[in-house]
Swiss-Prot record:
Cellular component terms per the entry's GO annotation: chloroplast; ribonucleoprotein complex; ribosome
Gene name linked to the record: rps3
Protein name: Small ribosomal subunit protein uS3c
Ribonucleoprotein among keywords: yes
Top-rank taxon, per record: Eukaryota
Amino acid sequence: MGQKINPLGFRLGITQNHRSYWFANKKYSKVFEEDKKIRDCIELYVQKHIKNSSNYGGIARVEIKRKTDLIQVEIYTGFPALLVESRGQGIEQLKLNVQNILSSEDRRLRMTLIEIAKPYGEPKILAKKIALKLESRVAFRRTMKKAIELAKKGNIKGIKIQIAGRLNGAEIARVEWAREGRVPLQTIRARINYCYYAAQTIYGVLGIKVWIFQDEE
């Protein structure tokens, strides 16, 4: 079962925490949709303004905490300085964009940038970097090898990368993967982070999956 199920949901409440902290009764679907819009707004802003930065670490995750009159958004990123333009205009513009999609104006919005010490130890950041390379028509084996080298700098215990689709423009789609170290998917106490990301290439969509084994509790 551990081989097929989503590693994050499998370990939720044990080694993984929720990404949203709030309670809603009748308004659950509305609040859930609002969280989705907030995350999409942040991702869109980053892709639009900072995608061309060669050393940008990307966004690892966005955590949303709600109170009666306060929405707190915490953005975990590899290089927060690249999100903060001159005099903090970058984060202020992002905050304004998020405020515009909120259904109620009487709630305060607090946005915080949290720096990740070793960004390439985060699967989402690594998967997006792989996608950028594949979309630039870099060979997939070379891309996977380079990604593993970057991840190993983050003091991880194991990593597995899988890419599926028309690799290198082949007529028949296939699946290729590479692994370094241990990735015990069936061990619940193992802290394994996971991400799926789709790369849009000229040959079609390539599915990228990244598993990173941090440590055991």
